[in-house]
């Protein structure tokens, strides 16, 4: 059996904006799966990078709340016997500690909660209907994990005609290769715009 090994040094840099200003009334912030299972050291599928991005997401949320931007939390949600457990083990079972949003990013009154059973937050949920009812056009997507639920949700957004913005320092990842691949796919295929830092997203 052979192995494929990418030449990392040959990968092209991805274009990234220093700053972006978005219409607060036409924008939603999508926080993907920032749950104890992934972002707390005691979680079953803990990623150190998920804990490291919490402060950047908090900064983004603070500005978004001041401007009354629509805020959406997605929650990976499973029930006993879910087929996904065959690949990832039992995790994010509804109403368990691991299923809950991390304390540092708890939703507030008026925030939207989307429980999803698969990677894409649009799949078999009311997310698209809710966003269209609010006349949302732009999505700022943050959370975990880059090449799985984040990328799947970006794909779902693109397929439904939304413009997607991705603050690079607010995306959790398994390793730098998977992060690059996810961001490459997001920009080259799904036309997402990368922003260097979540702290540099402004709403007006």
Question: Which stretches of residues belong to each language-model region?
Answer:
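Active-site flanking residues adjacent to catalytic metal/cofactor-binding acidic residues
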Residues: 32, 75, 168
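Acidic-leg catalytic submotif of subtilisin-like serine proteases
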Residues: 28-38
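A short alpha/beta connector and helix-capping loop motif
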Residues: 25, 43-75
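Active-site-adjacent betaalpha module
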Residues: 1-28, 62-66, 90-204
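Early exported N-terminus immediately downstream of N-terminal targeting peptides
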Residues: 71, 76-89
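Acidic/histidine-rich helix-loop elements
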Residues: 2-8, 40-48
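Short, glycine/acidic-enriched loop or turn micro-motifs at the edges of active sites
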Residues: 36, 79, 172
């Amino acid at each position: 059996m052979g192995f494929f090994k990418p030449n990392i040094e040959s990968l092209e840099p991805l274009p990234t904006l220093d700053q972006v200003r978005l219409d607060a009334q036409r924008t939603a912030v999508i926080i993907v799966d920032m749950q104890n299972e992934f972002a707390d050291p005691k979680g079953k599928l803990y990623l150190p990078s998920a804990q490291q991005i919490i402060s950047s997401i908090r900064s983004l949320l603070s500005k978004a709340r001041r401007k009354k931007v629509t805020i959406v939390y997605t929650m990976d949600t499973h029930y006993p016997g879910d087929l996904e457990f065959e690949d990832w083990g039992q995790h994010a079972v509804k109403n368990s500690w691991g299923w809950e949003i991390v304390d540092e990013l708890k939703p507030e009154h008026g925030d939207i909660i989307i429980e999803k059973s698969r990677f894409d937050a649009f799949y078999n949920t009311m997310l698209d209907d809710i966003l269209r009812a609010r006349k949302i056009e732009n999505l700022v997507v943050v959370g975990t994990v880059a090449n799985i639920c984040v990328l799947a949700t970006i794909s779902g957004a693109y397929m439904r005609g939304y413009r997607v913005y991705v603050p690079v320092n607010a995306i959790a990842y398994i390793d730098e290769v998977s992060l690059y691949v996810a961001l490459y796919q997001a920009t080259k295929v799904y036309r997402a715009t990368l922003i260097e830092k979540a702290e540099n997203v402004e709403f007006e």
